[in-house]
């Protein structure tokens, strides 16, 4: 209703009856806080933005690491971070930025009040250099220290302790109904490793379930095809790349899918691969959550719970700021919010939609774009500025 008022003269509401409901239950966004610390205030604003655009799922990727080749091919020097305060493992949280338990709980409470569910993600057994920096003996000597050693019982003890810290108690740190356990991009070079990976995945699905949570995983079980059973009932799988998890096979095995196809909805700022800015026109005119790569399902297929898009901060320290991230994410969020709500039945031409979305604010009380009104105007001017001099104008 506020968006209607924003687009009308004198903020008036037209007279009539509205009847509106979504085609897809889960409509979300994933943000990589592991490779780049995202300030709490930014996440708070994004909860408000998502609520304003009727998106209801924010996945927070809490750990990750850079690429070894950019750090002298030395794992010990490669950037890695885990972003949540830990009492079980003092010093595990990244020195350059982390969230206290109380901050993370309060963020989730804010989200709950706005009907946004936060899904925390601890990614393992790959992307785990932050954990092996802390406890080197659980790192894989064969596949790299960003992989956990799945043959070492200490690996399970460490990860059990980490998940337990945030899942147990009367007021757990992870408040929501769902917890994401990662499970993407682990090596499949040897059959015994694949079977260990499948066992690890099954263990942590059941482990988070033992605390009353619904487990979410990244799709990997086509890449890691094997004999060890992995629980599928009531498990949500992020379908990101069909070579890692064939969506038709995963549905047949019993998984419910979130559509997050990397070739269409991954933003990797200033990387030179994937999208820097999503092709919002193409997505608006062509995509719905039932299109996962080249696999296309009937609209509103009950096995596909909804869709998400993601920003991955792959290149550590590349100068990209949170303002830069917002500049990329915000138009994508506006566009995909419509597609995840309406599916194929959008009726407004893209040019009109694009004009309308630019006329709407980010959310009440949010101004990450630094807008000054809706009509461009002169703020101040100065004919020239001498080198090393200061202007009397404050930065805006």
Residue ranges of predicted features:
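Flexible, acidic glycine-rich loops studded with aromatic residues
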Residues: 227-235, 242-393
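Flexible loop/turn segments at secondary-structure boundaries
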Residues: 37-39, 65-69, 125-131, 186-190, ...
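Feature activates predominantly on carbohydrate-active enzymes
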Residues: 1-147, 154, 160-178, 308, ...
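Generic beta-strand/beta-sheet core signal
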Residues: 61-63, 119-125, 182-184, 216-220, ...
